[in-house]
Amino acid sequence: MKQKIVEPYAQALFRLKDDIDLTPLWEMARDSKFMQLLMNPSIPKEKKWQLFQPFDKLVQSWLEVIWKKKRMNLLAEICASYLELRKKKEGIVTVFVTSATPLTDTQTQQLEVQLTRMCQAKHLQCEYQVDAQLLAGLKIQMNGQLIDTSWQTQLKQLMKSLW
């Protein structure tokens, strides 16, 4: 339901201009203190609006529409949706890699070459994390798919088959 509300705002800005870096606005909107200030009815709108002065006129006009439609509480999600549209246009695929131990530079380079081929991306944006509970192997999440080669999962499957 939330996506149905969020996406039209992101798509509207994207259709007008598809190369705006909304990362600073997204980071501001993810800050709970910033959002409390923005949603505080005792602070005049003019004071709140000064926070958006660094952004260009198009972004300010877009924010005005979001404000009038009372959707500022969804600003972080709207910005994230816009940034995803930009990534898609630019051929950037975000990949989340979880390993049992930190990967070496050589391992990450080899993995990124293979993943780039697999997903046919122009650019790969990899985010790595370590989870010792995996025991060994990797979990790779990209394009809505999960590739799980961890020993933890293999052991669970073995236990299921035995019982």
UniProtKB/Swiss-Prot annotation:
Query: What protein name applies here?
Result: ATP synthase subunit delta, chloroplastic
Does Thylakoid count among this protein's keywords?
yes
What's the source species for this entry?
Answer: Cyanidioschyzon merolae (strain NIES-3377 / 10D)
Q: How does it assemble?
A: F-type ATPases have 2 components, F(1) - the catalytic core - and F(0) - the membrane proton channel. F(1) has five subunits: alpha(3), beta(3), gamma(1), delta(1), epsilon(1). CF(0) has four main subunits: a(1), b(1), b'(1) and c(10-14). The alpha and beta chains form an alternating ring which encloses part of the gamma chain. F(1) is attached to F(0) by a central stalk formed by the gamma and epsilon chains, while a peripheral stalk is formed by the delta, b and b' chains.
The record, for Pfam families, names: OSCP
| Membrane-topology descriptor | Peripheral membrane protein
Q: What is the lineage of its organism?
A: Eukaryota, Rhodophyta, Bangiophyceae, Cyanidiales, Cyanidiaceae
Entry keyword set: ATP synthesis, CF(1), Chloroplast, Hydrogen ion transport, Ion transport, Membrane, Plastid, Thylakoid, Transport
Offer an example of a GO molecular function term for this protein.
proton-transporting ATP synthase activity, rotational mechanism
Spell out the subcellular localization from the entry.
Plastid, Chloroplast thylakoid membrane
